């Protein structure tokens, strides 16, 4: 479930009337504004829509229980109190006091299909960075110039788009769900869990190379990974869990001693928070968004991006130093419990009030 969907759910629980709209023609406005650009002219609505539905793995009242089970939603992801719309235009059946775009594509819809002053753009990371969008980064740059009030989730974005006078809130995790199992097993084991997600910005190739170094150099290492990275690209010595359910991810965290995030660029990634809440020690590449809550040598080990060897070295160091492991684990769990669903919703509401 994506961060925007988690926010919608929590706001609904606080008795706000919330709706999620999936555009059935997501690039319609961009194609009209930039008719000469072939790389958006050829993009149809269905791939974008299907990708959003599959990647977010959440359920709402229009999905039958069997599909809900297949999508791996097995804890409190009930969206019965959130309205869901599939529409070509925002104006079709949706009348709201405020409209929030959650990426560069929907930003064009909010800017051109709502009244002035009602539109916001929640940007989780710099979508104009080529490592994220490649040859579409120019379109994201255009989105940041739209007359929308900008809301961001990390300090780097505050500085990068300072001229837009953005406001800040932090995302969070379901703290009652993510919790440790047996810390004794973690302290005596060599189980490493790696996030392997699709897209250049997620750094899966560096995670896999770090896993190879761990496998070759750390005795009795047990390496697991999860994500949506292509299965045929993951070596057989890695126990790979492709698109696991929420319950399965929790069990992976609980069994792991060290969690590795190899990403190049993130907004404010939740997996390290989930892992720390579940008792893991985190090793992360310095992918921007982790700076919100990770502090090197205090609650994690942070290493340069695009460097498999330093990821491996950090894991090895933690496994060899039990005192360091315990310090990072204890501080990590304390940190994670500050970033909760409830705090996320409260910070968001405060940020929105600031922009009225």
Question: Predicted segment positions?
Answer:
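Membrane-proximal helix-turn-helix segments that form the acceptor-binding/catalytic region
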Residues: 86-95, 127-152
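Acidic anion/phosphate-binding donor-loop and adjacent secondary structure
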Residues: 130-134, 165-189
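Conserved donor-binding/catalytic core segment of Leloir-type glycosyltransferases
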Residues: 151, 183-202, 208-213
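Short alpha-helical donor nucleotide-sugar binding micro-motif in glycosyltransferases
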Residues: 251-256
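Aromatic "clamp/platform" in nucleotide-sugar-dependent glycosyltransferases that forms part
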Residues: 264
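Short hydrophobic beta-strand element within catalytic cores of glycosyltransferases
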Residues: 281-284
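Conserved acidic donor-binding segment of nucleotide-sugar-dependent glycosyltransferases
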Residues: 296-297, 301-308, 317-322, 337
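C-terminal alpha-helical cap of glycosyltransferases
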Residues: 341-356
């Amino acid at each position: 479930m994506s961060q925007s969907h988690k926010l919608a759910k929590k706001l609904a629980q606080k008795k706000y009337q919330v709706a999620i709209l999936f555009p059935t023609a997501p690039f319609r406005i961009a194609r009209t504004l930039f008719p000469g650009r072939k790389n958006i002219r050829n993009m149809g609505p269905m791939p974008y829509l299907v990708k959003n539905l599959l990647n977010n793995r959440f359920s709402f009242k229009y999905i039958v229980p069997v599909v809900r089970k297949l999508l791996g939603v097995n804890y409190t992801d009930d969206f019965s109190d959130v309205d869901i719309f599939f529409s070509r235009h925002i104006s079709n059946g949706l009348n709201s006091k405020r409209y929030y775009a959650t990426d560069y594509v929907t930003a064009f819809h909010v800017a051109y299909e709502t009244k002035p002053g009602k539109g916001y753009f929640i940007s989780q990371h710099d979508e104009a960075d080529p490592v994220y969008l490649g040859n579409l980064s120019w379109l994201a740059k255009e989105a940041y110039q739209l007359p929308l009030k900008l809301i961001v989730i990390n300090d780097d974005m505050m500085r990068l788009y300072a001229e837009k006078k953005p406001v800040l809130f932090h995302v969070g995790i379901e703290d009652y769900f993510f919790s440790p199992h047996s810390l004794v097993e973690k302290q005596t084991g060599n189980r490493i869990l790696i996030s392997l997600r699709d897209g250049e910005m997620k750094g899966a190739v560096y995670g896999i190379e770090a896993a190879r170094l761990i496998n070759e150099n750390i005795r009795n290492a047990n390496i697991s990974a999860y994500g949506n990275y292509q299965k045929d690209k993951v070596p057989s010595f890695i126990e790979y869990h492709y698109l696991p359910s929420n319950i399965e991810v929790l069990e992976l965290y609980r069994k792991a001693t060290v969690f590795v995030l190899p990403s190049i660029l993130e907004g404010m990634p939740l997996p390290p928070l989930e892992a720390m809440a579940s008792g893991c020690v985190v090793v992360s590449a310095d992918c921007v968004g982790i700076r919100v809550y990770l502090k090197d040598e205090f609650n994690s080990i942070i290493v340069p991006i695009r460097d498999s060897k330093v990821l491996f070295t950090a894991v090895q160091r933690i496994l060899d130093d039990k005192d360091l492991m315990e310090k990072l684990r204890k501080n990590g769990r304390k940190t994670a419990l500050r970033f909760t669903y409830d705090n996320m919703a409260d910070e968001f509401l405060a940020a929105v009030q600031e922009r009225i």
